[in-house]
């Protein structure tokens, strides 16, 4: 499982090529997300986001020299033309049976199989903000209700085209 994230919410290019300004951008508190990843059972989870490296030239590391560098290069390298995305990636690998086995020395250390997931859940407090695209329609605006149900304190913004510059502005929507 790969979760691709961005450090920016107001990129004209990303809003344009991800659903022509009709999508949403969700702001996460990564420190709070990491706490949930600490508690994930049965998973190999890397709770830290890896920043994507942008390159003009392909320089593959040697797998036999440094396995970690090789993995990072394969999973976190993109062409330099994508640099405006400021992307970071998180990885969660499928559970392995031996990770889910209880400690043989501690019989009370049984794992409740209902708590083992292939995808960790995060709490509503992890969702800090939601940005609605410039061209979002009324049907999609029902997302505000869903967002408020997850986190009543979530901040909701409507993206608007700036009339004086080639950029987007995030306008805070008052609570209704």
PLM feature spans:
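Catalytic-core loop-and-flanking beta/alpha module that positions acidic residues
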Residues: 1-176
């Amino acid at each position: 499982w790969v979760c691709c994230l961005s450090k920016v919410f107001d990129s004209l290019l990303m809003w344009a090529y991800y659903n022509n300004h009709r999508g949403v951008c969700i702001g996460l508190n990564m420190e709070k997300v990491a706490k949930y990843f600490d508690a994930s059972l049965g998973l190999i989870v890397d709770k830290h986001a890896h920043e994507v490296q942008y390159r003009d030239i392909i320089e593959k590391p040697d797998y036999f020299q440094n396995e970690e560098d090789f993995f990072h290069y394969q999973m976190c390298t993109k062409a330099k033309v994508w640099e405006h995305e400021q992307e970071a990636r998180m990885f969660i690998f499928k559970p392995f049976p031996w990770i889910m086995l209880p400690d043989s020395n501690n019989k009370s250390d049984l794992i409740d199989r209902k708590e083992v997931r292939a995808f960790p859940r995060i709490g509503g407090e992890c969702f800090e903000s939601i940005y609605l695209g410039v061209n979002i329609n009324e049907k999609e605006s029902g997302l505000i209700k869903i967002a408020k149900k997850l986190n009543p304190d979530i901040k909701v913004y409507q993206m608007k085209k700036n009339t004086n510059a080639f950029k987007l502005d995030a306008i805070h929507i008052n609570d209704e």
